[in-house]
Regions:
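Short, charged interaction patches at domain edges and termini
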Residues: 1-19, 57-66, 105-142
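Short, solvent-exposed beta-strand edge segments and adjacent coil->beta transition regions
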Residues: 68-72
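Short, conserved charged micro-motifs
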Residues: 81-85
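Structural beta->alpha junctions
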Residues: 73-79
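A common structural junction motif
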Residues: 91-101
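Small/polar-rich, solvent-exposed N-terminal microdomains that initiate assembly or binding
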Residues: 1-62, 101
Length: 142
């Protein structure tokens, strides 16, 4: 029996971003770790910086073929400015049509909010976040 199976949107975006930023020549992105998890560091924060958390805030599925998800990109860095810059870089990379073309299943990504900087209330470390809405083709699996 074959059936459409929803995709883990956060993991798909994390894979797409790892590939998209691999060739990025920007010192603020040097050593950036991209993950769908955080919480193993001090006070529940990331284990290292710079760190990008890819999380899913909302998800809908237009059965059987298309999913839509709101993705939150949270960047921790050494300064609020650098965190905001990383959030902007990865948001731009995600919304670049070349990223969708290079990522099987990712049809489109559009910005939902611009990067905003803040301080992590749990760790006191600088962070920034942005959101994007992604459209994903749902694969058929047997």
């Amino acid at each position: 029996v074959t059936a459409p199976v929803p995709v883990d949107a956060a993991e798909l975006v994390a894979r797409a971003l790892r590939a998209a930023i691999a060739g990025l020549d920007d010192p603020v992105a040097a050593g950036l770790k991209i993950s769908t998890q955080v919480g193993r560091g001090r006070d529940g924060g990331p284990p290292s910086r710079p760190w990008l958390l890819v999380a899913e805030d909302a998800h809908s599925w237009r059965w059987p073929a298309v999913q839509s998800a709101t993705i939150r990109l949270t960047a921790w860095h050494h300064t609020e400015h650098d965190a905001k810059r990383v959030a902007g870089l990865v948001l731009g990379a995600l919304c670049d049509r070349a990223t969708a073309a290079a990522t099987p299943g990712l049809l489109l990504a559009e910005p939902d909010s611009a990067p905003l900087s803040d301080v992590d209330p749990y760790t006191g470390e600088p962070l920034a976040f942005a959101t994007a809405v992604v459209t994903i083709r749902t694969p058929i699996r047997s």
